[in-house]
Amino acid sequence: MNANPKFLSADAHVDAAAVAPLPNSRKVYVTGSQPDIRVPMREITQADTPTGFGGEKNPPIYVYDTSGPYTDPEAKIDIRAGLAALRQGWIDARGDTEVLGGLSSEYGLERAADPATADLRFPGLHRNPRRAQAGKNVSQMHYARQGIITPEMEYIAIRENQRRAEYLESLKASGPNGAKLAAMMGRQHPGQAFGAAAFGANAPAEITPEFVRSEVACGRAIIPANINHPESEPMIIGRNFLVKINANIGNSAVTSSIGEEVDKMTWAIRWGGDTVMDLSTGKHIHETREWIIRNSPVPIGTVPIYQALEKVNGKAEDLTWEIFRDTLIEQAEQGVDYFTIHAGVRLQYVPLTANRMTGIVSRGGSIMAKWCLAHHKESFLYEHFEEICEIMKAYDVSFSLGDGLRPGSIYDANDEAQLGELKTLGELTQIAWKHDVQVMIEGPGHVPMQLIKENMDLQLDWCKEAPFYTLGPLTTDIAPGYDHITSGIGAAMIGWFGTAMLCYVTPKEHLGLPNKDDVKEGIITYKLAAHAADLAKGHPGAQVRDNALSKARFEFRWEDQFNIGLDPDKAREFHDETLPKDSAKVAHFCSMCGPHFCSMKITQDVREFAAQQGVSETEALKKGMEVKAVEFVKTGAEIYHRQ
């Protein structure tokens, strides 16, 4: 991969399409208990209800916003300088970290001294890395277990509630029918949650900072927030919160540049990526990651074994604990928020994959399996796990314990190798928690629908309710090019059953490296799956957006329908393919049914007739049927008429 001169020039910038506010939307900030707790949300403005339907005001709705300052017209975006260090003051105030004299990883120092990388380096970082003071633990779990509510926890509580209470109050104040309108728009179907301590058993109707603290303390949720990534906006991953999604980006040995990866990151968070994983395996991994982290308002995850493998020229058998340890420190000092570590791939499990249809499909899993077989020894990740915990708690890096033996086909789903590894991940979780290190567990993979719930149930049991983070799962293997759909089905199901974060799949899965369009398609598909899961679980306020869009649809407020949806651009594009004129944006029909057969228009006509006649809608329908019956007889009682 070569340096992109335009990207590295003084006027380097992100794609204009990624920084423009979404239609009829603006960035708003909700202030917490102190002035520097400013929680971003997206406010979507709505038009008034047409006079014929009552003429009431429709106040703005608020939705979760992952785009950081990029969609704020007031923010100055300079990717060479990076984002503001939002959390720096909070980290300083705790007084338990120390600023290092410089990088402490051997590889980091080597890259910094290499003149060949000078033009690739991120130029805007003017601070040295931090780590915990000797004997200190700086993890959010450690603070939570001490009974401390951090600013990050308060920030998250405000963010998860999405100003739902304020929205309902604004409905009540919207006019004489305000109370009735608030009751209608706030209505939500009861959810059905699964597993121990399922949502609703101990969760408040409104998320509080104390509830956030308690969920992190018991390990049921994590706040990925490395002290060296102060630019990140705090978020939480846990099944008693909104289901989150992750987007994967990263270069390979044959394609992509630093600039393209930063563009993918900003594009992913625009459409709703809650976290981003940099899975780069090509050249300049260190420099690419620095640019991404410094410009990312969301947590960044990595798979450190990928870079460690590059350091030994791709020979898995040449990997050592010392090389891997140095890689962990290198990435922790850059600010990576969570590491995928395949410590559950043990020597004893590798032979269990011999009878699989598709063997070991995880890159990290196959690397460690090859190392174990080459040395006929237990994995150094497993053997040195407690030492890894010491590194993690010094920077507050969260574990994402990797499923290196996940099934790569539905043929292999829920087999002995997969479940053996899952049980080991549960044992490792207990060790990490002993160090107050945050943990989530990665899950499959390819699983048919009838076996999905078993995965969730076993994970809750064996991993003691640590958050589950799954890739799909893909529910069938027959649709290359459509695996965002095959996996979206499984993602919605497992999210309902209790998975806390879903790793997106793009249409390019199994076929190639995704471009920006593929990233957007994967994000939107997974936002849909996550939201469907929130509805099914009965998460407080999950139905507000659905209700608002449905009301706009019934009232033919086309622009509001587009703007409240997950992808306003595509909705508008599809509508305009057949009805492009501005007048169609206020028409009481669309191109599917036309003006005479629109079910919603017919319903409105019935209501209008009922109001004029002073009768109920049921009586109006009865009278209407009687009139039509007379017409039918008068025209010859023929079902079909020849023209």
Curated annotation (Swiss-Prot):
Gene3D superfamilies: 6.10.250.620, Radical SAM ThiC family, central domain
Family: Belongs to the ThiC family.
Keywords: 4Fe-4S, Iron, Iron-sulfur, Lyase, Metal-binding, S-adenosyl-L-methionine, Thiamine biosynthesis, Zinc
Keyword DNA-binding in record: no
Binding-site positions, [4Fe-4S] cluster: 590, 593, 598
Annotated residues for binding of substrate: 248, 277, 306, 342, 362-364, 403-406, 442, 469
An example Gene Ontology biological process: thiamine diphosphate biosynthetic process
Note accompanying the cofactor annotation: Binds 1 [4Fe-4S] cluster per subunit. The cluster is coordinated with 3 cysteines and an exchangeable S-adenosyl-L-methionine.
Catalytic activity: 5-amino-1-(5-phospho-beta-D-ribosyl)imidazole + S-adenosyl-L-methionine = 4-amino-2-methyl-5-(phosphooxymethyl)pyrimidine + CO + 5'-deoxyadenosine + formate + L-methionine + 3 H(+)
Enzyme Commission number(s) from the entry: 4.1.99.17
One Gene Ontology molecular-function label: zinc ion binding
Function: Catalyzes the synthesis of the hydroxymethylpyrimidine phosphate (HMP-P) moiety of thiamine from aminoimidazole ribotide (AIR) in a radical S-adenosyl-L-methionine (SAM)-dependent reaction.
Highest classification ranks of the organism: Bacteria, Pseudomonadati, Pseudomonadota, Betaproteobacteria, Burkholderiales
NCBIfam families: PRK09284.1, PRK13352.1, thiC
HAMAP family registered for this protein in UniProt: ThiC
Tree of life domain: Bacteria
Protein name in UniProt: Phosphomethylpyrimidine synthase
Pathway membership: Cofactor biosynthesis; thiamine diphosphate biosynthesis
Oligomer status and interactors: Homodimer.
GO cellular component, one term: cytosol
InterPro entries: ThiC (IPR037509), ThiC-associated_dom (IPR025747), ThiC/Bza_core_dom (IPR038521), ThiC/BzaA/B (IPR002817)
